[in-house]
Amino acid sequence: MSGLYLALRTLHIVSATILFGTGLGSAFYLWMAHRSGDPRSIATVSRHVVIADFLFIAPAAVVQPLSGVALAWASGVDLLASWLVAAYVLYALAGACWVPVIRLQIRIRDLAGVAVAGSRPLPPAYRRCIAIWFALGWPAFGAFLVIFWLMVAKPDPW
């Protein structure tokens, strides 16, 4: 194995770990804050989740496909291999879920912040946002699990 291949593979694995791990951790903490019902907790956690999105998830989301294509090219894998095409589609699905989730998390942060500042309960808009956020998380999570399997198994489904 060449040094380039090992560097690309390491970059790809590390960025996948950051993307999946930070996403899962952020979802867990925001969901637990929501379950507490405490606007202060929700405001604090959602503020940190939004920061984590921009510091960790966004860069990893860019590095992931770039390092993946470079890794496939460096290892001589056909970029249109069926398992890679399936991974591309699933990655696009996860991204299509993640983009609105970013906006929802910003809205959740803002709604909770206003509730805390005004010593008021969370408004109905908060409940709508968290419900949509929760619903969008599942297909993205499932897509990433299947992508991990595709990267390891490299099956030839068609």
Question: For the regions a protein language model found, what residue spans apply to each?
Answer:
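Polytopic transmembrane helical bundles with strong interfacial aromatic enrichment
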Residues: 1-158
